[in-house]
């Protein structure tokens, strides 16, 4: 049983959903991003979704683009990110760790090379944000070869065939997008998603985590009430870093408190 399966099994027994924060590795600096991970885990994060800074993030709104810029300003490279991932894995052996990246980052290392690096660093899953499920074959093959779960986005306007492919090809969890567009806490998650979740369930998809626009505990409660296995929050977490990174101690406290509030909302 892999780490995601163990997590969802444990949460089901506890009658809880998962809360998964997203942050950019290297934001605002590599060392501070390790302290940020510690604060998220201390607040109760069930898993982590982590980004590698990229210069042209098409699915990201201004908040997460800003995180990438801060990471670039602190000279964070992909190699630095893999080194950070290894340190996070060593500290948290049971925590599911996912990467959310763009195809160029994978391609520049050769696809097999990228997934091998993920395996060596202890990464559980990879979501390539700009590769739709219909075009995923080389990425999926490399992921399978190196024991990495492939995460796919179930779009809000996806037809049955797309959702069926997402269900059949995905492992770990399904990234359920609550609305079209780019990431951002400024634009609220579009509910309801029960229909999408039911369709995914019919196709035996991995557990669905709802993302895009999740910034408040009430949205986490609504997602779980709609049948999601949990929720992912990126922009709202990164916004705390953006606002308070000049005062690291205060920032880390705010992050921990935010996660505590969101995690408390996962009780079924």
Curated annotation (Swiss-Prot):
This is Tryptophan synthase alpha chain. GO terms for molecular function: tryptophan synthase activity. InterPro entries: Aldolase_TIM, RibuloseP-bd_barrel, Trp_synthase_alpha_AS, Trp_synthase_suA. Keywords: Amino-acid biosynthesis, Aromatic amino acid biosynthesis, Lyase, Tryptophan biosynthesis. Pathway: Amino-acid biosynthesis; L-tryptophan biosynthesis; L-tryptophan from chorismate: step 5/5. Belongs to the TrpA family. It catalyses: (1S,2R)-1-C-(indol-3-yl)glycerol 3-phosphate + L-serine = D-glyceraldehyde 3-phosphate + L-tryptophan + H2O. The alpha subunit is responsible for the aldol cleavage of indoleglycerol phosphate to indole and glyceraldehyde 3-phosphate. The active site is at 49 (proton acceptor), 60 (proton acceptor). It comes from the Bacteria. Tetramer of two alpha and two beta chains. Its EC number is 4.2.1.20.
